[in-house]
């Protein structure tokens, strides 16, 4: 006797209808037709939550319908990693459909790309042959991990199954090779596509943009238009990334106008890219305008605007927007929290940083590698090395940025020995950023020989090419040690053109050491730099000339500063009062501090100082 004869469809429909009140009776009339498996497939199509899916699974078990391959795609579609993994683990023989959905979920939804590749290998080991859908997501995973070796191996297997000419797979291959730094090969694949569509152009333009080949992306975009292809949202998003890289505000504005002309809606994806582009180009007003125009603002849009404020030194605005985001009910993710922590570190907002750590714990994000690295960086910049070390040691996984943050925290707080010991412990290959922290530690501690040794080890042991920041550190190290001749010789060895920061280190030492010959050469070089915008260098040079009783030359240096439009950046301080960050600028009035009562508070403080008989000069805030 069949299962269908034992259990009436009406009874099954009524049982599930009680738990699916949103399903209409008419839909169950349709569900009564056919066998039970078809009934369950019908219900799975209508399922809109994990809770409903669990109820369907319970009914399937109750009616002895063992079809876990039915459930896995819907669980992945609903985005529940734990439930999807459970269903997959209890499935004795997952089919193509289940493997493909799990690999897609791991790649696109859960960003566990290593697990996606592992599942691909398991699929092959089980005897199932990957198809074009499998390969697409495998190449995406390789791109995200920059696993060029695995990608090439999988690419070679396409020829065995006759998929080497599949257009959709080639699009994924272009992205993978570009992401892995093989831009030339990506372009070769693109040129071999005989019938290109918009997706083909987007793949190559996006590949160029993400790999940092912004000019090539621009050139290909123009060629795309010349050949009559209409750009879509993805095209504009990739081009906005290229504009950000080049700082090309004019083209960025034209792209926004193009989106309006072609009636490409301001989605959160496009809007967020516009915000980031305007932020990278320094146009904060336009970034905020786009943000305000967005009807639907998701977490990505909020984070993009907060990042713009943080990266442009507007920490107070970043904090305000973060609190506003939470009030609207949008929950922050690891990217949001790490951005806010960066803003906290830049202004020394320690108490707010502590609140963010508590908030991260509430969201179970305290061990997220980006959040934890942000905490290490924030505590280090706020002078709390012990707290930075606490977070660092508790991290289950550390990447290069984590080690760099802790080394830099030690270096900037004068703990050179600890910084160098930590560098020796480093379990991942160091980068040029790592050596900036290491050399900075040597500068703070006056470790001349060690600093020079680390500088040479960059290239001899680690194959890294020293950049201007590394040369500047060594010049600063030698200058502070009074080795001005050596510092000057070292600067002359720099393969590029010395900048004003290098000269600042030498001029500062000359001012203290009274080295006339070198300071004259340094000042002459500074005056020849038409692009020099560091006000401190002009002030130091003017003071040096004044010390030499060269009053006319000192005045000329100040005049040169004015002629070049160099303005001395006003002193700026921040203070946290009752959870509010107040900003004070030298020369500003009271109301710019963000509190109307700040002026009266300051007056009371002055009166209190008078009563305590403190001596002070004229103060103007």
UniProtKB/Swiss-Prot annotation:
InterPro entries: E_motif, Pentatricopeptide_rpt, PPR_At4g14850-like_plant, TPR-like_helical_dom_sf. Residues 502-578 are annotated as: Type E motif. This is Pentatricopeptide repeat-containing protein At2g34400. Residues 579-610 are annotated as: Type E(+) motif. The gene is PCMP-E23. One of its GO terms (molecular function) is RNA binding. The lineage of its organism: Eukaryota, Viridiplantae, Streptophyta, Embryophyta, Tracheophyta. PPR repeats lie at residues 95-130, 131-165, 166-196, 197-231, 232-266, 267-297, 298-332, 333-367, 368-398, 399-429, 431-461, 467-497. Belongs to the PPR family. PCMP-E subfamily. Keywords: Repeat. It comes from Arabidopsis thaliana (Mouse-ear cress). PROSITE patterns: PPR. GO terms for biological process: RNA modification.
